[in-house]
Amino acid sequence: MSAPARVLVVDDSATMRGLITAVLSSDPEVNVIGQAGDALEAREAIKRLNPDVLTLDIEMPNMNGLDFLEKIMTLRPMPVIMVSTMTHRGAEATLAALEIGAFDCVGKPAPGELRPFGDLAEKVKAAARTQRQYSQPVVAVAPPPSVADFRVGRKIVAIGSSTGGVEALIAVLQKFPANCPPTVITQHMPPTFTKSFAERLNRLCAPVVQEATDGARLEIGKIYLAPGGERHLQVSGASAPCCRLIDRAPVNGHRPSVDVLFDSVAELAGRNAVGVILTGMGRDGAAGLLKMRHAGARTLGQNEKTCVVYGMPRVAHELGAVEQQLPLSAIGEEILKMTAARKEGTE
């Protein structure tokens, strides 16, 4: 049995520090070794205690969590899980933190409600196990134009991701031209965060990126991100494919679930689809990707070396759902090769 993950909890609220500590301490594989109320205390505690993982509040006095995270990633890179308020402002800051190099994020619960912290211990343990090489922040690059040598076919692209997915999706989607194939995405994220993430992707990428709405028609040049929260994203409509937001219990512990999306794409599009599974904890999406492959779709998985967490892609690969495993840098271009029209009137 491996040693428990050693965690330092950083939050300016004593109540929140106590709550996070209590949640984490209920797991025997996690050891909270200290607490800090601001960046100065945290810096000294990191030197003294040498934690495996940090939980870090976004909003703190003196130096906010985002500025402190940048210093950590420069001076002492380590896995950091951001703890943020469930607001638009909190979501924007958290997305920036994930691009800087934070491992993952959780939303602060409302009074008397602990659900956002339900998987915190699992995220901490995954963070402690990761061999990730912490890197420089994602740099926005000029997106590719709509180019004459890319003619989109009739395929739908479906992508699933979780931990590490913010950076991974940016890397993939920045390869897409403005006339990309219709693309649907489920990324595990807290409610309110997905709208901000869609807006951020829309600024960084050539296609139109939007949070999916029920009934939104799938169109060339548009990317649809499943909203976090209470419903799953599916696609339906043989003659006019569109997004559907479905009320249903969580699948694999997630809502929205990648498996639910992939299952619907397999049923609707069959061989006229490409399925992609990116970095993430657990197994969500693996069975759905296998269903897509059995239906004739092309399928890709992110390789172990470039994953923040090689969980979802690993299970998919072991099931035989993945046609090709590729480094993150190659996935966007491969999707375009698989979806381009070969000649007039073909896919």
From Swiss-Prot:
Q: What is its EC number?
A: 3.1.1.61, 3.5.1.44
Keywords, sorted A to Z: Chemotaxis, Cytoplasm, Hydrolase, Phosphoprotein
Which InterPro entries does the record match to this protein?
CheB-like (IPR008248), CheB_C (IPR035909), CheY-like_superfamily (IPR011006), Sig_transdc_resp-reg_Me-estase (IPR000673), Sig_transdc_resp-reg_receiver (IPR001789)
Q: Which residues form the CheB-type methylesterase domain?
A: 150-342
Database matches in CDD domains: CheB_Rec (cd16432), REC_CheB-like (cd17541)
Q: Which family does it belong to?
A: Belongs to the CheB family.
Swiss-Prot/TrEMBL domain comment: Contains a C-terminal catalytic domain, and an N-terminal region which modulates catalytic activity.
- Quote the protein name from its UniProt record: Protein-glutamate methylesterase/protein-glutamine glutaminase 1
Q: Which organism is it from?
A: Rhizobium johnstonii (strain DSM 114642 / LMG 32736 / 3841) (Rhizobium leguminosarum bv. viciae)
Q: What is the lineage of its organism?
A: Bacteria, Pseudomonadati, Pseudomonadota, Alphaproteobacteria, Hyphomicrobiales
